[in-house]
Amino acid sequence: MASLNTQIIAYLTVNNITYTPGDYQTGQPEGQSDQILSWNTEKLGAEPTQAQLDEAYPIWEGQQIQAQNKTTAVSLLSATDWTCTIDIADIQYSNPYLTNQADFLTYRSAVRAIAVNPPTTPAVFPTEPTEQWSS
C-alpha cells in the first residue's frame, strides 16, 4: 500500500491541483496511523476523503507507468535512428551495408506503436534485432 503522502500526491496530480511543499502536512501522532495534520483548503480545496485518495491512486499509478513506457520507447527509437537512413542498407552508398534493415523497420514500428499510445501497464518491448552487415 502506498504511503499517505504518495496517495495525496496522486490525488492532487490526478485532479490537476497545483501544490507546493507546505500546502499540506502528514504525520503519525503517537500511537496512531499516518494522517493529514494540516491542509490548505484555500489553495487545495476540501481535504480529500480516504475514498477519494483510493480512487485517485490507481489512475495516477497508471499515468506514471504510461509516462515511463513512452520515455523508454522514445529512447529505444532514438538509439536505432541510424538504421533508417537510406544509405545504410544500400550497396550503392555503403560498403559494408546493413542487410537486415527490414528487421529494424519492423522493430521500430512496434516500438513506435508503444511511444504513440503508451499503455498504463508495464509494456513488453520487442527485442532489438542484431545488426547484420554485408561482408
Could you describe each region identified by the protein language model?
Residues M1-S135:
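A preference for well-ordered globular domain cores
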